[in-house]
UniProtKB/Swiss-Prot annotation:
Positions with biased composition (Low complexity): 711-724
Gene Ontology biological-process entries: ERAD pathway; negative regulation of growth; proteasome-mediated ubiquitin-dependent protein catabolic process; protein ubiquitination; ventral midline development
Subunit record text: Interacts with VHL. Interacts with the MPN domain of CSN5. Interacts with EIF3F and EIF3H.
Primary location group: endoplasmic reticulum
GO cellular component, one term: endomembrane system
Name of the protein described by the UniProt record: Protein TRC8 homolog
Annotated transmembrane regions: 124-144, 147-167, 200-220, 233-253, 256-276, 350-370, 392-412, 425-445, 461-481, 488-508, 539-559
Organism in which the protein naturally occurs: Drosophila melanogaster
Function: Plays a role in growth inhibition that is dependent upon COP9 signalosome subunits CSN5 and CSN6. May modulate signalosome levels or compartmentalization. Probably functions in the same or a related pathway to VHL during early midline development.
Entry-linked PROSITE patterns: ZF_RING_2
InterPro entries referenced in this protein's UniProt entry, alphabetically: HRD1_E3_ubiq-ligases (IPR050731), TRC8_N_dom (IPR025754), Znf_RING (IPR001841), Znf_RING/FYVE/PHD (IPR013083)
Keywords: Endoplasmic reticulum, Membrane, Metal-binding, Transmembrane, Transmembrane helix, Zinc, Zinc-finger
Record's subcellular location: Endoplasmic reticulum membrane
PANTHER family according to UniProt: E3 UBIQUITIN-PROTEIN LIGASE RNF139, RING ZINC FINGER PROTEIN
Length: 809
């Protein structure tokens, strides 16, 4: 990325910060609602803000003092009377019911109360203005960069106009108490003119500033650009100061600033009227673009696209950093008798840093950046460059924001807010330990399984595991020694112990793989040991998941009554936790257990190979390519390790080499006498091969494939009367001959399979599958070889086509 692109990106981020600051200030005012609607937010604020409280500003120095006093007077005067009336009405409703005469009379008094009407009207006006400002700031924040530049140019030109007016008023105030400058110039009174404290030296900065503001306004304003007006704009801005040098009456001089800003105001109004339709068209086009994008790609794709376009994380980080610097500067410049305590200042900054939802979002962005670089640091230490850790910052940010919403962080009093913030950070730290374990665990497995000889990588991975265990144990020791038992402490304990168990399971698996790598012979019990270790870890995680669900239910029922929003979010998160971390995990664990149990049962049914058979076999296992000192014999007379065969049975029941059914079934045992007719009966009856497909079975039952060549040869003379029929018949005869050869091949293969299955039935005490070849009087078996199935299907289809040609003839 070039330097120019980085600079433009930084400028775009900085331009989007002011709308966020406006939204933050509106949220500080609680959207214009009265402060008595949120009483808990201002309680105990004195204990936290007393040492750093700013001194009272004199009313003459604050231009908004009268407005603040008006709203505060209205609030304080109406609050006590209104609260008393509401309390009386609520008590009457509780005592006598809402339909009682006392309650109705109190409600009538409240409806006629002028104080209540004034408060409601003032609150309504403030709320409407705050909503309008909130929506305007949000729209400005979401504008494209080109439109954002135009908005800032308009606001800058408007600001220059008011700044010029204020500067002219201040400059003219200096000339009122001084002699005429024209007389000094005409008399060449250099002493007064060059006096450092004189009026000339005082007006010089104002004159230069007016000239510069006039040139800047002429350059950036969006109104009509007339050539003469553009050139005379600096003179128009500086005209009040220049005319004040003349001996004019005081009444005329007082109105000069208003006359000077008349031209810029006219140009600004023209710009506003011309841009009104353009602004509404831009908003409408943005709405249409969003609707089309959602209909084509979905809402999530729109949010992701706009998130990247607006560069929201960096905007929030810059906003929160500016907010933190502003708060730190206010604390540093506050005059106080006591010295500034670092701990108190940090506490005050952190509390103010999560005062509103926008501030919480900014803190979330900063925490996300810290977690991202922590993950990058551990990756660098572990000598790995996997891209999975890129989600570490995003997941930690989402987790912190959900915790803030669940606990109602912004609605708490400052002291409670600081305690809750520290608890949320502890929970986030335990989650971060889980993420770090997810990074180091695959590295441990790869190092042990690949037999990596690099000791440096082994030592680094093991040191990270030791760090996770030590940090978790230290955190638990500190919390249990300093805090009393609570639901939050139980949650942190569960997460920390789960981290320790996960690390121990990873180390045990790593140790088993290392021991297996050092052994000279095949370790058949390795799979069992790994299964037991991982089953222990998964069982502990499942138990902690149930414990956390019960803990969350307790918090939801007994501790979240005053926070409806947080309670709703907690309920949703509990449902997600119950489904993914409890139900899905239990179902997956039960499935693995049943597969393993079924595989063990099937393996135990197979015969064990004797040393003589292994010596005669004298080969390796076809699955793991290791020497066989013990083996299981399948129904198709293949030798495999019992452990390897068990892993294979997790996937399918067919032999890895010949794809035959490996296991013996009791159903075949019952049908064994019927499946093996006498040799004389087999000689008298034609043999049939039944394919797997039901449609092909029906075709095979309709016409025997072995008789097809004979019938074709008998009907061949009849097909010579028509050339078209002869062509079809010739093709059919050739296809049938080929299919008959395939059937003969399949019959030989099936006869070998039947002899092999007979041997297996003897060795396994009659527990085998049904025979693949039966007499014509017997019902077709459920399975057959794939070669026989293909050959039979081809023969039956070709015979059917040949019969159709004969019917046409």
């Amino acid at each position: 990325m070039s330097v120019r692109t980085k600079v433009l990106g930084l400028v775009d981020v900085m331009m989007r910060v002011p709308p966020v600051m406006v939204i933050d200030e509106i949220l500080k005012m609680d959207m214009g609602m009265q402060s008595w609607l949120y009483p808990d937010k201002d309680k105990a604020s004195g204990a936290l803000a007393t040492p750093t409280e700013a001194p009272a500003v004199p009313s003459g120095q604050d231009p908004f003092t009268s407005i603040k006093e008006l709203f505060s007077h209205m609030t304080t005067s109406a609050q006590s009377v209104l609260e008393q009336s509401i309390e009386k009405a609520s008590e009457a409703a509780k005592t006598h019911g809402m339909l009682s005469s006392g309650f109705n009379s109190l409600m009538n008094e409240l409806s006629k109360d002028q104080t209540l009407a004034d408060v409601l009207s003032t609150t309504t006006v403030k709320f409407v203005l705050c909503v309008f400002a909130f929506l305007s700031a949000a729209c400005i924040f979401m504008l494209w960069t080109r439109h954002l530049v135009m908005v800032y140019m308009f606001l800058t030109s408007l600001g220059l106009t008011f700044l010029s007016y204020w500067s002219n008023v201040s400059a003219l105030a200096l000339t009122e108490r001084s002699p005429s400058m024209v007389e000094d110039l005409m008399s060449l009174n250099t002493t007064r003119l060059l006096d450092s404290g004189g009026v000339v030296m005082s007006l010089a900065p104002h004159l230069m500033a007016q000239w510069f503001m006039g040139m800047l306004f002429a350059y950036i304003h969006l109104g009509p650009r007339f050539e003469h007006v553009q050139r005379s704009m600096p003179i128009i801005f500086a005209s009040p100061i220049l005319l004040a040098m003349l001996p004019l009456p005081a009444k005329v001089v007082q109105h000069l600033p208003v006359v000077a800003v008349f031209t810029p105001i006219i140009l600004t109004k023209i710009t506003l009227m011309q841009s009104a339709m353009e602004a509404s068209r831009t908003v409408y086009n943005g709405y249409q673009y969003a609707m089309n994008f959602v209909s084509n790609f979905g809402l999530s794709a729109l949010i992701e696209n706009e998130w990247q376009r607006l560069n929201v994380p960096n905007v929030l980080r810059v906003f929160w950093t500016i907010r933190l610097i502003q708060g730190g500067y206010a604390l540093a410049t506050t005059e106080s008798d006591e010295p500034l305590d670092l701990m108190t200042a940090t506490q005050k900054l952190l509390v103010d840093g999560c005062e509103t939802m926008t501030a919480v979002l900014g803190m979330t962005g900063v925490i996300s950046m810290f977690c991202h670089y922590i993950g990058r640091g551990f990756q660098w230490y572990l000598l790995t460059y996997d891209d999975e850790e890129k989600s570490l910052g995003t997941v930690s940010a989402v987790l912190f924001y959900i915790l803030a919403l669940q606990t109602g962080l912004t609605s708490l009093s400052p002291d409670k807010r600081f305690i809750r913030l520290c608890r949320n950070l502890c929970l986030l730290m335990t989650a971060l330990l889980h993420f770090l374990h997810n990074i180091v665990s695959p590295i441990l497995m790869s190092l042990s399984a690949a037999r990596n000889p690099s000791r440096k990588r082994h030592v680094r991975a093991l040191s990270v595991c030791a760090f996770l265990v030590v940090l978790s144990v230290s955190l638990l020791y500190h919390l249990w020694s300093q805090q009393s038992i609570s639901t939050w402490l139980l949650a942190v304990t569960a997460f920390s112990v789960e981290v320790v168990v996960k690390v121990l399971v990873s180390l045990a698996t790593y140790t088993l793989f290392l021991l297996d790598a050092r052994r000279q012979f095949f370790w058949e019990k390795l799979d069992d040991y790994l299964y037991y270790v991982r089953a222990f870890g998964n069982s502990v995680e499942f138990c902690f998941g149930i414990l956390l669900f019960i803990n969350g239910a307790w918090i939801l029922i007994f501790e979240s009554a005053q926070n409806a929003t947080g309670g709703g979010i907690r309920a949703i998160m509990m449902c997600i936790h119950a489904y993914f971390n409890i139900w899905c995990e239990a179902r997956a664990g039960w499935s693995v257990f049943m597969k393993r149990r079924s595989a063990v049962h099937k393996i135990s049914a197979l015969p064990e190979a004797t040393p003589a058979q292994l010596q005669a076999f004298d080969d390796v296992c076809a699955i793991c390519y290791q020497e066989m000192y013990s083996a299981k014999i399948t129904r198709c007379r293949h030798f495999f390790h019992g452990v390897c065969l068990r892993k294979w049975l997790y996937v399918q029941d067919r032999c890895p080499l010949c794809h035959e059914i490996m296991m013996y079934t009791d159903k075949a045992d019952e049908n064994a006498p019927e499946a093996e007719p006498a040799p004389a009966a087999q000689a008298e009856q034609p043999m049939r091969i039944y394919p797997r497909d039901d449609a092909n079975n029906a075709a095979a039952q309709r016409r025997s494939p072995e008789r097809a060549p004979v019938e074709a040869s008998e009907q061949a003379p009849a097909t010579s009367s028509s050339s078209a029929a002869a062509t079809i018949g010739a093709e059919a005869v050739s296809a049938i001959v080929e299919s008959a050869a395939a059937v003969g091949e399949a019959r030989s293969l099936v006869s070998v399979a039947s002899s092999s299955s007979a041997t297996h039935r003897i060795s396994a005490s009659g527990s085998s599958d049904s025979s693949y070849m039966t007499a014509s009087a017997q019902s077709p078996p459920p399975t057959a070889t794939s070669a026989a199935a293909v050959a039979t299907a081809a023969a039956s289809n070709t015979t059917h086509m040949f019969r159709m040609s004969q019917d046409q003839q």
